[in-house]
Amino acid sequence: MPESAREFFEQLGSRPRSAGARGLTASYRFDVEDEGSWRLEVDDGVVSVEESAAAADCIIWSSEETLMRIVRGEESAMGAYLAGKVKVAGDVGLAVRLRDLLA
């Protein structure tokens, strides 16, 4: 289990493609407060990750603490969003597809 946002994004690019993410082609940017920005390029469920603040189809903001609680399954992404701990801009529908990508 990753210990930090940086470690999470470094590991994400080396994961095998999730069956639920087949057919998903999109770009995401995660802006993690005080830690940095990572851009995920998804092509038919295959993920490439780079540390970048470049434009993306879906942009997600959160603190590192909130992100890691979601990654560890200690908090739901939807619950964090509804509580205002996570903000989303751009194609919000793509944020919902993250479950498929990260499963």
Enumerate the predicted regions with their spans.
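Feature captures hydrophobic
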Residues: M1-A103
